[in-house]
């Protein structure tokens, strides 16, 4: 069977990573604008002030999307571009930009998918406590209301939060990302709970103010788990490990269940409640009802996974990777199996249609003497991973796949040192070059994965 006729093939980006124009068009500052002003925070002190200059070049970029056959494009709205302080006055210039982008996409028969939050927390909200401030639930709700009012006449697909594991864990536990803090564990659980409530309020606002029926989802991340063999006990071990909370305290955010059980099952996992009881904020029935506001689809960002088997003691154990295990340029393991087992386990537990909202590879791409960008490693990666996804499509309700990323961009703490794109960006000239993988992806889309 493979992928259905309605399967959505797309690519994804986020606002700060590509837009540039950080100080233009009435935009307010967000935490990444401020964070990157401090030397030593990002590789080689890179910033996103210009990035891919997509703010000025979006029409060219949409033409490139069409040239590689994209059916859909997932992008984030910069909260601080449309509401500079995060609350209060609306910036109409920002609204105009996103309206123009949406219209250009639709003119080129590319379906827009909007992510409300991909880490651009308005700095004025951060100064008021950010995710620690319970008011953020209503501020985020008002922002979602604005998005619904201005864009939902044309855009029907939305994801609320992108990778809350990252913006809480990397931003406030390890300090690797903006705002670069290392706060007490207790504070991170409060932030996480507020973020989950903000998600629920956003779902409510999108439903209430949408100008047509909307498809609303959520896009967390996590390393998936896959079994060493297809023996029943290894499969069960991988499933148990995926939904357990095995991480040490400083990495507690890197799990699936804490972030997805409340949204889709209506409660936090019992294991986590017991383990972290002393760190938890007050959690009410009203909170849980809000967090569990019904969504339509489940998005998951998947890049790699851990191989698991059932140990001799009857407990799941991770299988150590062999020396020389294949890795991407950024150092992430290459584990195609995760794109079969991950969606399968998620669908079995949560029962919602699944989108792969991000998946891709960083490679050391260069422009060759012939003026082209030959990236056979990316083509090989995509072929291996999508072959596994095709297996999953035979067994579960799988709706779409968004390759990360449309184009090379500002890769957070790595700056411009990592290239994930199907399209090469020369940051000195802003020239774009479609990589070999972009053409491979186009051909794969045309035959709907029949060649995998």
Residue ranges and their predicted role:
Residues 29-63:
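Aromatic- and Gly/Pro-rich amphipathic surface segment
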Residues 6-8, 55, 72:
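A common structural microfeature
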């Amino acid at each position: 069977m493979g992928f259905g006729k309605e399967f959505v093939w797309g690519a994804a980006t986020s606002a700060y990573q590509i837009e540039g124009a950080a100080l233009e068009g009435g935009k307010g500052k967000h935490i990444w604008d401020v964070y990157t002003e401090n030397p030593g925070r990002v590789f080689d002190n890179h910033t996103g002030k210009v990035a891919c200059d997509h703010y000025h070049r979006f029409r060219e970029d949409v033409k490139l999307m069409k040239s590689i056959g994209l059916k859909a494009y997932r992008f984030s709205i910069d909260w601080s571009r449309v509401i500079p302080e995060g609350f209060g006055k609306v910036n109409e210039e920002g609204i105009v930009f996103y309206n123009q982008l949406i219209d250009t996409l639709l003119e080129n028969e590319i379906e827009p998918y909007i992510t409300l939050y991909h880490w651009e927390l308005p700095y004025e909200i951060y100064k008021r406590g950010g995710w620690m401030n319970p008011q953020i639930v209503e501020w985020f709700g008002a922002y979602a209301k604005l998005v619904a009012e201005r864009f939902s006449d044309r855009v029907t697909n939305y994801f609320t939060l992108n990778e809350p594991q990252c913006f809480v864990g990397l931003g406030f536990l390890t300090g690797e990302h903006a705002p670069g803090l290392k706060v007490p564990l207790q504070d991170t659980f409060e932030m996480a709970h507020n973020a989950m409530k903000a998600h629920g309020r956003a779902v409510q606002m999108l439903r209430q103010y949408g100008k047509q029926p909307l498809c609303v989802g959520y896009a967390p991340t996590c390393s998936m788990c896959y079994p060493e063999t297809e023996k029943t006990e290894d499969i069960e071990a991988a499933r148990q490990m995926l939904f357990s909370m095995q991480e040490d305290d400083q990495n507690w955010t890197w799990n699936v269940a804490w972030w997805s059980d409340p949204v889709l099952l209506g409660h936090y996992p019992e294991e986590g409640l017991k383990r972290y009881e002393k760190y938890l904020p007050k959690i009410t029935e009203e909170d849980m009802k809000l967090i569990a506001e019904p969504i339509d689809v489940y998005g998951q960002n998947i890049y790699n996974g851990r191989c698991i088997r059932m140990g001799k003691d009857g407990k799941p154990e991770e299988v150590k990777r062999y020396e020389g295990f294949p890795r991407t340029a950024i150092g992430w393991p290459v584990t195609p199996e995760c794109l079969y087992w991950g969606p399968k386990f998620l669908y079995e537990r949560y029962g919602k249609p699944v989108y792969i909202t991000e998946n891709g590879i960083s490679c050391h791409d260069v422009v060759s003497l012939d003026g082209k960008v030959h990236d056979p490693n990316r083509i090989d990666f995509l072929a291996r991973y999508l072959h596994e996804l095709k297996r999953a499509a035979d067994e579960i309700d799988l709706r779409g796949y968004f390759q990360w990323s449309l184009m090379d961009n500002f890769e957070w703490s790595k700056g411009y040192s990592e290239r994930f794109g199907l399209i090469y960006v020369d940051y000195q000239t802003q020239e774009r070059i479609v990589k070999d993988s972009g053409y491979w992806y186009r051909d794969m889309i045309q035959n709907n994965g029949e060649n995998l």
